[in-house]
Amino acid sequence: MTEQLKQKLNDSAVLRWSVLALVAFTMLCGYFLTDVMSPLKPMLEKELLWDSLDYGFFTSAYGWFNVFLLMLIFGGIILDKMGVRFTGMGACLLMVFGCGLKYYAITTTFPEGAMLFGFKMQVTLAALGYAIFGVGVEIAGITVSKIIVKWFKGKEMALAMGLEMATARIGTTLAMVLTVPVAAFTAAMRIKMF
């Protein structure tokens, strides 16, 4: 009966394209958060006293767990064993947790000279958050591909995958275009309020 119900859900064009919009928006947010720090490098150097080594350490963190701990392979195994709902929710939770840790690290003032693994504590915690976020967003990408394959068949599948990726990359564009003006605006608002 569930197979028959699933078949009927897949037949609904409105539902099919709504699912695509939902997963594409999720990936748009993921790509936005992946690239949001790039335009802020000068601000990080000026306000948080990061240098190029700190920034390079931070940005390299995105691939740490995916490459060295083979998390993408484990993510694929989990996706095959547990399904798209479990894996998708888990990936989103990893993204939120990693992003929260990165935000905490960047907005918290740590004691001067506090070091962790030879780097400033702030940089290390931000990098750890970014590494966790990276696992979540990459596993979400695998999950989105499987969702598209489940919902779309034939000639629509390639179009759906292309639309999802194009929508996700809009997140990168938004990060490059909006980040500095928003940061400058919020900094100006903080100055006016205090």
Can you say where each PLM-predicted feature lies in the sequence?
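Helix-loop-helix hairpin linking two adjacent transmembrane segments in secondary transporters
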Residues: 164-194
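Central cavity-lining transmembrane alpha-helices of secondary-active solute carriers
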Residues: 60-77
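C-terminal ends and interior cores of transmembrane alpha-helices
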Residues: 93-118
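Small-residue-rich segments within alpha-helical transmembrane domains of MFS-like 12-TM solute carriers
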Residues: 31, 35, 118, 122, ...
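Small-residue-rich transmembrane alpha-helices and their cytosolic helix-loop interfaces
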Residues: 27, 59, 63, 92, ...
